[in-house]
Regions:
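Core catalytic region of metal-dependent phosphoesterases/phosphodiesterases
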Residues: 2, 11, 36-184
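Active-site-proximal beta-strand elements of phosphoester/diester hydrolases
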Residues: 21-31, 186-198, 229-233, 300-306, ...
Length: 333
């Protein structure tokens, strides 16, 4: 069942007995990389998981205009240089652009000029392309995922607030944000895609005290926190799961002695919730470089990390039976 504010609203997970093993696949931070999303779905089907969970930051960050010129050629700028192709190269170009997490957009010289002069036009195009891409991605679930597997997506800090509505409207995917989901008869999952402040000033950031209040509100819906799964996009502060490069005022990594200086950037509120409630599992993401697993008290916490720009899926295959964790396996490919 799925509950919002403590009320049962939707039954979408197959009932499983307490003595049966439950298997989940957890990945995060795909950032518009179509290859990574497809691998996530394929791996979920191949591994026959009960629940496939995408922990946040599903959408891409920018569009790449593919501009048709008067000569019938197409030009686009990617990876530091301008590419010129004819119509026979469009399919490959679109695939390459999508593969690294950008959104290709076919346009003409007139519209492209308007986009360079009007930021509002760029935002409108981005909205339309992001919306159509997500809809197409979610349509793949029915094609690739067995009916016995359910897919849960929780928007992350880089996902615009309108993404929630797009997820809610699609019948094959469940929006985890702020909800309690019965993964099986003995384990509930509560999800939050909001994070503590970052230098990037993204859509779902808030101060630690506000994030703590939000998490407390979400957790209050859980019946048994000791067997719960906390699917919180922000990793807990000062753990191996939250180390990221220290940045200068221009947002460039600081290098000392030939090495990038790394600092903890996770959430103190998330760590406080884990230490206070000691849930069964903590599923985290947000910090791409900090993949790994660790325990905080009795709680097993993971961050798969992300290499979305390379089209690589990084995930954890997690299996448990009752209060016993029987598998915690890193998946990469």
């Amino acid at each position: 069942m799925c509950r919002i504010n403590g009320e049962s609203t939707l039954s979408f997970l197959l009932k499983r007995k307490k003595d049966e093993s439950t298997k989940i696949l957890f990945a995060t931070d795909m950032h518009g990389s179509e290859g990574t999303w497809r691998k996530f779905l394929n791996a979920s089907a191949m591994l026959k998981v009960d629940v496939a969970i995408c922990g946040g930051d599903l959408t891409g960050k920018m569009i790449v205009p593919v501009v048709e010129g008067k000569d019938g050629k197409f030009a686009y700028y990617l990876m530091g240089r301008t590419h010129t192709i004819d119509s026979s190269g469009l399919e490959k170009a679109f695939k390459d652009i999508r593969g690294i997490g950008y959104y290709p957009y076919s346009t003409n010289e007139g519209e492209y000029k308007e986009m360079t002069e009007n930021p509002k036009k760029v935002d409108e195009v981005f909205h339309d392309v992001m919306t159509s891409t997500l809809s197409r991605w979610f349509d793949l679930i029915h094609e690739k995922i067995p009916s016995g597997t359910r897919v849960v997506v929780c928007p992350g800090n880089d996902d615009r607030l309108l993404v929630d509505k797009l997820i809610d409207e699609h019948k094959d995917v469940i929006n985890g944000e702020g909800k309690v989901i019965d993964v099986d008869e003995g384990h509930e999952m509560v999800s939050c895609g909001w994070v503590n402040p970052s230098p990037w000033k993204t859509a779902r950031e808030e101060e630690e005290d506000k994030l703590e209040a939000r998490l407390e509100k979400y957790i209050s819906q859980v019946k048994n926190v000791k067997t719960a799964i906390f699917n919180f996009h922000a990793p807990p502060f000062q753990t191996r799961l939250d180390e990221a490069p220290l940045l200068d005022k221009d947002l460039n990594p600081i290098i000392q002695g030939g090495s990038v200086v790394m600092i903890p950037v996770g959430s103190k509120a998330v760590r406080k919730m884990i230490e206070k409630y000691q849930p069964f599992l903590g599923l985290h993401g947000h910090i791409h470089e900090a993949s790994g697993s660790m325990k905080i008290g009795r709680t097993h916490c993971v961050n798969p990390g992300s290499e979305y720009a390379e089209g690589i899926i990084r995930a954890f295959l997690i299996e448990f039976k009752g209060d016993k964790l029987t598998r915690l396996q890193r998946i990469e490919g």
